[in-house]
Amino acid sequence: MARPKSSGSRMDRQLEHDVCELVRQVTGLQDEADPNFQLALDFVWSNFRFHRFLDVNSHKVEKTIEGIYEKFTIHSDLNKAASWKRLTKEFLNASLPSTEKIKTDAHYSILSLLLCLSDSPSNSNYVETPREKEVEKKDDFDWGKYLMEGEEIGLGPNIDTPNWSEDSDDEDAQQPLSREDSGIQVDRTPLEEQDHNRKGGPQVCWEDEPDSRSWLEQHVVHQYWTTRRFRIPHSAHLHSNLAAVWDQHLYSSDPLYVPDDRVVVTETQVIRETLWLLSGVKKMFIFQLIDGKVTVRNNIIVTHLTHSCLRSVLEQIAAYGQVVFRLQEFIDEVMGHSSESLPPGNGPIPKKQPDAPFRTYQAFMWALYKYFINFKEELTDIEKCVISSDTTITLAIVVNKLAPRLAQLKVLDKVFSTGVAEVPPDTRNVVRASHLLNTLYKAILEYDNVGEASEQTVSLLFSLWVETVRPYLQTVDEWIVHGHLWDGAREFIIQRNKNVPVNHRDFWYATYTLYSVSEKTENEDKVSDSASASSGSDQGPSSRQHTMVSFLKPVLKQIIMAGKSMQLLKNLNCAEGPACQAAARDAERKSLYTLFLESIQLRLQHGEDSAPHIVNEDQTTKENLIKMQSIAERHLELDDIHDPLLAINFARLYLEQSDFHEKFAGGDICVDRSSESVTCQTFELTLRSCLYPHIDKQYLHCCGNLMQTLKRDFRLVEYLQAMRNFFLMEGGDTMYDFYTSIFDKIREKETWQNVSFLNVQLQEAVGQRYPEDSLRLSISFENVDTTKKKLPVHILDGLTLSYKVPWPVDIVISVECQKIYNQVFLLLLQIKWAKYSLDVLLFGELGNAAERSQAKEDIPRDQDTPSQFGPPKESLRQQIHRMFLLRVKLMHFVNSLHNYIMTRILHSTGLEFQHQVEEAKDLDQLIKIHYRYLSTIHDRCLLREKVSFVKEAIMKVLNLALMFAEGWQAGLGAWQMESIEKMESDFKNCHMFLVTILNKAVCRGSFPHLESLALSLMAGMEQS
């Protein structure tokens, strides 16, 4: 546009100069003749002259000022807060150079500009600079005296009485009487009865309307709630006088009928009090609140309805009003507004709870509060329609409009009664919270199964549930993210046992308690979370239905594992690195509840966006449905079920799951609640897709970090390997040096049970190859039953190996685990003792003993004297040969057993165990893997009571081997032929028994790992 011509006004010239200077400063152009300068100048003038901007919002500025004041107060900047409050107040109450008024738009515009500039503050400490206010000099000069100097003023006799002119009276009479104040009531009757002498006085003149007085009379409500009767004008039509006609009929049919004294109200007044009742108003005329119950006044009638008809409708409305009062009372109680302040007779006075309501009740109250806000807005809109009278509004129309809301109130009352009101007052908070959430959850499932008919009800219940579950999800989020289970009101189903510290070895098992309450018996049980976590989704007896929060059952194990893992990580001081980095990451992180809401929104938007896509690709959907139906039919035919309807419903169910559809149909399908959709999204699927993945993700993150920390920083795998090296003797050379020193002492009949000797030998053996483990290993000896000690194989009973496992590795390698390790260790020691005793026997020793025995036979002796010792009838060489054969048989048996235990059991099972340890996702899974590994080797080493007879047979053979080695070492002179024959017979019987038992077990397939041992022992049997 063209540049405006400058006028002679000084302000216009100054404005033009300022605009040119603005263009120079912003664009950098200096020459006014430059075309670019002119374009910029025209643009600025265009914005100044033709653009319109909104006026400043004084309420918004006041709210911002108050918010800054509260912020200063919260941050303990009290000086700043006081200074800010005082300066802004002084500025708003001061006049500006351009105006004398206060709190003008100019004031608020300047403050708005300063507030906008404060969005990018500088980091500086504010110190208020005191300013001296300019005091206006009071003009003491008497201008009146100065100006009236020399003038004579005549004062009349009535100086104190002002002389009002008739013009002023006329002006007063012409003052308009505004009708903005709706409280003014003009009564015509007193005006008509006024004295006629005053008719000539000033009259009230009504402006704006020619008939303002009649307007005021029409818009002021008659006080129908008083005893004074008013005649309500209405039509003379028969339908408008139905009440009178009905009374006339009753009077004509019953001469003794006497009509009651009734108050006639209009239908509009009934509608208005109906809206007030549903809004929560307690003081009304038509509806009365007596002892907490809403009743209808009996003497109310309208002209066009019979008394019974009106009362029937109003009693139904009163029932819904009762629901509103009941829910509002709960809201007030939770918010802290006690009902004790109500006047007597307005309702029952419940006992005030000593403790504040817990967070789940507060969240439920907040959900109801938001619902009633929307409900009251709808009631306000209806009331505005009634006031405007643009359309016909009857009580039936209002009830019809409110029918969906009234149905929702009925559902809310049912949920509130079941979930809150019917719970005994002395019930624990954990039971109250769980019961309320379960009630909402079951109600959603119940109405969701109905389908489209209850879509609004499901939407209402789902919004209530989402709001009510917020504290639970916040508690879960705080626990699985920060490792802190904050639950001051003890409403969460998992409670922390503060008696067990984190660095205790029983932390993983005894720190948390899972509360489970039976609905039938209402008795509270405390179940260890380790048991519940290990059982997964296992349920208790069918006769007990627990009130555990239903929606958390599928992920309860993940929550417990993630929470304990994160707390353990926090205690290890290596969870998230430096605290500043963790705080920064936590500030950027979204809470579990926020992620849940976002997932729900995405799911709903996805369903809405995909509805046209489904309609457009209806043919593709039908083809996929037919394909799924054929698959379902084939699966049903395998079970001899021929049901086409069942098959097509299975097909629809499968199509709902995207992973199944991608696997079999190669695509994706989205469903909605319309009739064209394949099926409807159930509430469980919503939770499975919107809530559970976020919990699983945090579970994998926490437990993965804990496993990595234990393996990397606390050498968990190395400690497990050390247990196998020493207890299971995988460190062969080290343990060989240890136990051979003990075996040599036993063979030489020397004392070896000294604990100091045992520990010295152990330290010397371990310290050479595993110096870091030598300080952790120790051995002790305890005396056992003397009857067992008579047998050579039980001479080692009482040896106990101990390994000091540091925290937190002792959570995995517990004392109970070391007991199982020691049982296997003792068995291996007995087998190696028998094997060592047979291995150290030399053929030369027996040959030298035979030569010495033969030399003794050359000495003449009495042939008739029987020899107590020495070989009987058979020759000495034949006896030596039999002993050689028995030794080989015993060695074959012991070596077969030794190889089976060390290779097939310990080595193979150990490889599987190492692979499972690497794949363990959480500490609980690792503990189970370790226990399963110990249980496996315990069973396969035949240490279980069920197969004790097999172990006894093996122990008998080992005992024979040790007795044979002891006799071999003593020489032939200590043997009798009967002893050798008995030993051969016992060995043969035990051997045959074991082979038979093992073969039967292998043939049944119950113990496949025994197959190698059975084949090895069969190879050593004598062929008949």
Swiss-Prot record:
Keywords attached to this entry: Cytoplasm, Cytoskeleton, Microtubule
UniProt cross-references to Gene3D superfamilies, sorted A to Z: Gamma-tubulin complex, C-terminal domain (1.20.120.1900)
InterPro entries assigned: GCP, GCP_C, GCP_C_sf, GCP_N
Region (Disordered): 153-203, 523-545, 853-873
Keyword Calcium included in the entry's annotation: no
Basic and acidic residues compositional bias, start-end: 189-198, 853-864
Domain of life assignment: Eukaryota
Coiled-coil spans in chain: none
Entry's Gene Ontology molecular function annotations: gamma-tubulin binding; microtubule binding
UniProt biased composition (Low complexity): 529-543
Biological processes annotated in GO: microtubule nucleation
GO cellular component: centrosome; ciliary basal body; cytosol; gamma-tubulin ring complex; microtubule; spindle pole
Location of this chain's protein in the cell: Cytoplasm, Cytoskeleton, Microtubule organizing center, Centrosome
Main localization category: cytoplasm
SUBUNIT field: Component of the gamma-tubulin ring complex (gTuRC) consisting of TUBGCP2, TUBGCP3, TUBGCP4, TUBGCP5 and TUBGCP6 and gamma-tubulin TUBG1 or TUBG2. TUBGCP2, TUBGCP3, TUBGCP4, TUBGCP5 and TUBGCP6 assemble in a 5:5:2:1:1 stoichiometry; each is associated with a gamma-tubulin, thereby arranging 14 gamma-tubulins in a helical manner. Gamma-tubulin at the first position is blocked by TUBGCP3 at the last position, allowing 13 protafilaments to grow into a microtubule.
Family that this chain belongs to: Belongs to the TUBGCP family.
Function: Component of the gamma-tubulin ring complex (gTuRC) which mediates microtubule nucleation. The gTuRC regulates the minus-end nucleation of alpha-beta tubulin heterodimers that grow into microtubule protafilaments, a critical step in centrosome duplication and spindle formation.
Protein name, as recorded: Gamma-tubulin complex component 5
Organism of this sequence: Mus musculus
Gene: Tubgcp5
